[in-house]
Amino acid sequence: MQNAPKCYLPNSRKGRDVNFHDRGPETLKCLYDESEDNNNFTMHSESIGPKSLDSLSPRRLSNYSSAVDPRTTSLEDVPRLILTRSNSQEQTPLRTHTPVEYMSDSIHKSLADLQLGGSSYSVAESPVPVLQSSAVSEADDMASAHSAHPSRKASRSLRLFESSTSNNLETGNSTNTALHNVSSPLESVSERLSKSGSPSVGAQHDLDEVISEKDTSLSRRSSRGRSSAPKRRKDSGSSKTTATYIPHNPSKKSSQHLPLLPDASFELERSVSRSYQSPASTPRSSVSSVSSSPPEDHPFFHWNVDYPVTVRLEPFKHQVGGHTAFFRFSKRAVCKPLTRNENTFYETIEACHPELLPFIPKYIGVLNVTHTITKTEENDSTTEYVNTESSSKTPAPHKHTFNSCYQKKDYGYIPEVSVEQNRHIFPEWMLPDKRSHSYGSPKSLHHKSSSAGERPVSPTFVADIPPKTPWGTTLINRKLREEVLREVFAPKHARRRLGTRFHSRSSHRPSVFRDNSVAFGQLDNGNTSSRARDKDADPNKSLSCSVEDKHYDLHSAVAEENEEVDEELLNVPSNNQGKSYRRFSSDAVWEEPESNEFPRVSGTMEDYDSRESTGHTIKELRSTPNSHGTVPDDSIFAMDNEENSELPPPLEPAEIGDPFRSVNDPRRVLSLPHMASADEDHRIPASDNQNNNNNDANALAENSESQHSTQIERYIVIEDLTSGMKRPCVLDVKMGTRQYGIMATEKKKASQTKKCAMTTSRVLGVRICGMQVWHPWLQSYTFEDKYVGRDIKAGEEFQHALMRYLGKTDDDEDNSHLLVHHIPTIIRKLEQLEQIVRFLKGSRLYASSLLFLYDGEPPPSDKSSKEKVKPREIDIRIVDFANCVFAEDKELLAKATCPPQHKDTYDRGYVRGLRTLRLYFLKIWKEAKGMQIAERGYEDSLSNAYDELGGLMSYSNDDDSCGETST
């Protein structure tokens, strides 16, 4: 009896699980009030109360009616029902029909009227003898009872099991019915129904509807079934196994939408219970948790109003260093405009250099992001330049003071991500369907310099050749990719339950990535590099300035001493009022001069190669009046903007309509802030827009079409390195002695060489680009931008800058706040990274950066536990791969205009920077430990404090190759 199958009988108050012996005689008695003589339990029990017919689900009604299908069921198989009126206490069975009467249509009419009876009648069940089914069906049920999920077992409580020892086997009827049939006469209800005035309809038609609804009702109820706590009862003296249905109402309904992964821990089935169907019926299948892909009707992608097909990217707050705008894609992922072949660098690392994976952010894929541009503003806007010299009369504040950013937030665009534009990044099982869509599949073009194969980009055309390997998506971090996509495109109600509203998603954590957001007052001609943000500025209160497209007087900025600005006229109208400029960063700039290799995106949105992606250069920038009289923040990034007069042409706006919004939808006009002016009067209020719709809808439609153009831009999606940190502290350092790529022009080469010579890059192989540090005792952040780093000199200044990142302040004379416990981990990881880079013969990490990250919030102390909570280990990651190249990319190296001087060796400038960091951190650690020992009076034991790190500094100090600046 221990291994006997179980029949779960759920109930809203109690439940049973009744064991029956494998092919052995046994009678199972379903007990409700713990009394074994309660075999005549009906639904009129006082503990339950009467149950009206309209309260029964279609599934239960179909269980009664499906058993009497005249096409598959014999007359002896008709179940018996006891019908009484709801307002009556009588439970006397009605008259039983004779076998002759079963041949008439009255019995079928009774069943049909039974469905239409509504609340006038209630149902009571009595213990009934069970039809003997075939041995095959019995064996299948026994096997399923052992392995079935609890939800499947709960659904089997609707069946009436039988003994396999009976002699009256009717294989044909039992195996072709969806549920086990019951052999008993049916009480006629036609007379009482006719007396009550209930309408009567054709029995055969209604029976067909009931039977057709059976599978649908079972599938609809499958996700809601729950099994109650079982109790075992047995009676060893019976020859048959019986079970009586006990009413069951689930106490808690599960969600109708469950975005599941393939490795979910529970089953997702189209039909919870096993179906025994006739040969004419279509067999139903189920998919278990071990399946490689979910079913076609997976609830994750029932695209309705609950599932967003377009999501808006939110700004990623307070980047550290740089000025490329980062956006938050989810809680665990961020994205930025794709520059050159940066994504192929990640994909090459995954395929060829997995040893670098611990030192790079987890790569997720490439997104096609939609930008909407208001074309009327291009013609109406007037370019107003701000003279930087006029605002530079007051000396800039000292680099250790912090000023707030007073500029008005003016976002030039808000990018949006749609499912239709990004089918390539979704796993196949996540897509709504696997056929060719009306929008078409993206055309695949072979990537010239990468072995990633063919890849999809824009899903607005029909694919000529299916992609062989996924382009623009990770091959390793698949689990993270699916978690991020599930989070972003989860149902709206699910996001509300989780307490995360996607459109209001924001993080209290500052960003680790580069920030062009710095505060500055009036500038001084002699010192334009000492700028910082106010320590009182709460990073949680405002959006990042990094996505502001402030506009400035380009000619005045170029005239400024020691400032270098790249300029490129994007679209030159006939008048000078519509001028638009494009800016580039040296970290993510295109260097290939072959303009014919960068096709324009036409109205058909023709595909273009990832190398031809112009990154953030797609943005059309316009000047805006500066009401505060200060220099917009674009001008202070001039040093990172490299000269390159031969740049790829911009992407032409694709004149396509928004497939997810109607023309008259006012949200379409207001989907993005205006780019031309900061004046709010130029914007169209929603109320005015609605009035225009009421007055002249056609005119508004034409106006909307003429005002908007859509551009597609590629964004790279990577892991959010600050995920899980309460107060991330970040240091961004530019690595290497060479900051220009292999496709740089002579002008760019000269500019970057001069820049490295003026900073610590040439001498140390590293320069500081920015940092943010959280001080727990002050409950505030301190920030330093890249211009502070450019003024730092090698020696004590560089060492003090690293100490400030570890928590030291000006008033911390005894280094009590210095987090020296991070230094051993830093040195260990820098040594590991150096060993990896030394093995990358022929590869170059030009203009890449290292990010140092740790959580500035100390871990909570658990007073109840004796063990001290260990803080999170500091992390080191490489970012900015736009100008990097691997030795495997033979084709690109062959076309290089500025190839590496030592092609067969490693990146010596990068190794020099790693060695510099190790030496400086080691010196900080020794001085901090020495000071602590000296204060305690143990100067003689000072050398013992160095034993912890002495073994780590095992590299050769006479490596002359690290002294060469030309790599």
Swiss-Prot record:
It is found in: Cytoplasm. One of its GO terms (molecular function) is inositol-1,4,5,6-tetrakisphosphate 3-kinase activity. Residues 14-23, 205-218, 608-622 have a biased composition (Basic and acidic residues). Residues 278-294, 686-704 have a biased composition (Low complexity). GO terms for cellular component: cytoplasm; cytosol; nucleus. Substrate binds at P728, C729, V730, L731, D732, V733, K734, M735, G736. The modification Phosphoserine is found at S86, S585. Its EC number is 2.7.-.-. InterPro entries: IPK (IPR005522), IPK_sf (IPR038286). It comes from the Eukaryota. Belongs to the inositol phosphokinase (IPK) family. This is Uncharacterized inositol polyphosphate kinase C970.08. The lineage of its organism: Eukaryota, Fungi, Dikarya, Ascomycota, Taphrinomycotina.
